[in-house]
Amino acid sequence: MERLKAALQDCDVVVIGAGAGLSTAAGFVYTGERFENYFSDFAKKYGIKDMYSGGFYPFATPEEHWAYWSRYIYINRYMDAPKPVYDDLLKLVNGKDYFVITTNVDHCFQKAGFDKKRLFYTQGDYGLFQCSEPCCQETFDNEAVIREMVKWQENMKVPTELLPTCPHCGKPLTMNLRSDNKFVEDKGWHRAAERYENFLRTREGQKILFLELGVGYNTPVIIKYPFWQMTAKNPNAIYACINQGQAVCPQEIQQRSICMNADVGYIVSLAV
């Protein structure tokens, strides 16, 4: 803990890499009581066991599909995080030169007040639709229609007139989430990717803390492996990994690494 505090104090730059474990620590849990509270009807009718697997359920109609998804998006994107982990994290980097790269799609960084120009969320956003085709590299804000779907759904179906369609080609809209090669990387996505690359390039060789939070091995090529490589390349860099159950680093950077097998929220609250 002391080493982490010292690293935060001494560094000129903080690059945060955030995975699903960070949002879990903030209370966005997809199982158990939270699932029961919001999806007991779906669990009963369809045998769905948790929110995540429900997202893959082959519903017979689009009205049922969107009844499930609108509720899912509403509670995981438009409701506030149950615990203040993201707020604590913002306090931690306040006044620092920082950038955030995240595979999370729940918008928690923006909601906590992180600078949007210092954020790159690589895998999409629960708050955006895209064309299912896709006929265009464009995304569409979904808040208004999601709130309507949640409000007007009955018997686990949304009214047909609320089904979202592409304004350009009329095909159904779908979530802007990376699951296959149809994922739309819109102008905003490319601008964020460019800002992240620029940030790293212009801070090469500086005292950088690569702070990895709640990142597992689902997509290690996005955050984990690059953080290891950049730490190995820069003798002034420190790699810190906080993750329940999986906090490791390669031997080459062991001397300049802080690996904490612990609850991310707890450690962040201690570090503030």
Q: Model-derived features: where do they sit?
A:
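Conserved catalytic alpha/beta core of Sir2/sirtuin-type deacylases, generalized to analogous enzyme cores
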Residues: M1-V272
